[in-house]
Regions:
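Acidic, serine/threonine-rich low-complexity disordered tracts
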Residues: 28-113, 118-122, 127-218
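Bacterial N-terminal signal peptides that target proteins for export
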Residues: 2-15
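Bacterial N-terminal signal peptides
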Residues: 13-23
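Residue-level detector of intrinsically disordered, flexible termini
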Residues: 5-6, 18, 27-28
């Protein structure tokens, strides 16, 4: 079974107003997004995001675990962990590890003089300054024309369109949300944000017409 990640932070390349948890300390604020992940109508795992903001500095950590079974036999497994540091809206560093059906991927990168240096399974290369990953949690990432895939280290050209204001079901609630469509090579997904700009939901089209969905934990 082949799945293309909505996470692009993964297949989750990949992939909240009502469930955004916000706590403030003396110097830092922490936000969390906790999603259940569904393949069509079947729950297959989770993807959690934790953000710590301290002035202009931001640290984001994510973890995803997915498993697809047929007759209780695992046919697909996925684990993704990623830590990113940001400063003034620019990616400063990334360190990720992914196990997709036993295939291991590592991505490490740091901002440096002349660009952003990335090391992946395929080697080392330099990207432009002030790049972004598929940072769904920050709607500003939609301004970029290319995004770093945190699973593979690929720098992916994307096309992003604003669809409009739509009603979104979130658990037992119906919310007014802004919908966007993001497309790239082997990638098609939709994102929803609240009126205040908080990330609410994600849906990704997979091979064979199946849908991968992120549903916020209530």
């Amino acid at each position: 079974m082949t799945m293309r990640s909505a996470t692009h932070s993964g297949p989750l390349h990949w992939f909240m107003c009502c469930a955004l948890l916000l706590s403030s300390g003396l110097h830092a604020a922490t936000k969390e997004w906790r999603f259940r992940v569904y393949l069509d109508e079947r729950e297959i795992g989770y993807h959690h995001f934790s953000l710590i903001e301290n002035g202009s500095e931001t640290r984001m950590t994510t973890r995803a675990e997915l498993e697809v079974t047929v007759l209780r036999i695992p046919v697909f497994s996925y684990m993704h962990e990623n830590t990113e540091r940001w400063s003034n809206g620019c990616l400063e560093s990334i360190a990720s590890v992914t196990d997709e059906n036993g295939d291991l991927y590592r991505v490490d990168g740091d901002a440096a003089a002349g660009g952003f240096r990335v090391t992946t399974n395929d080697g080392e290369f330099v990207l432009p300054d002030c790049i972004s990953t598929f940072a769904y949690w920050d709607r500003e990432f939609l301004q970029h024309k290319a995004l770093l895939n945190s699973q593979t280290g690929e720098y992916v050209d994307v096309e992003i369109d604003y669809i409009g204001e739509r009603l979104l079901s979130a658990g037992e609630k119906t919310l007014s949300a802004h919908q966007y469509r993001l497309e790239g090579e082997d990638l098609e997904l939709e994102l929803w944000y609240s009126q205040e700009g908080h990330w609410l939901a994600l849906q990704s089209s997979l091979e064979g017409g199946r849908l991968l969905r992120y549903e916020i934990e209530q």
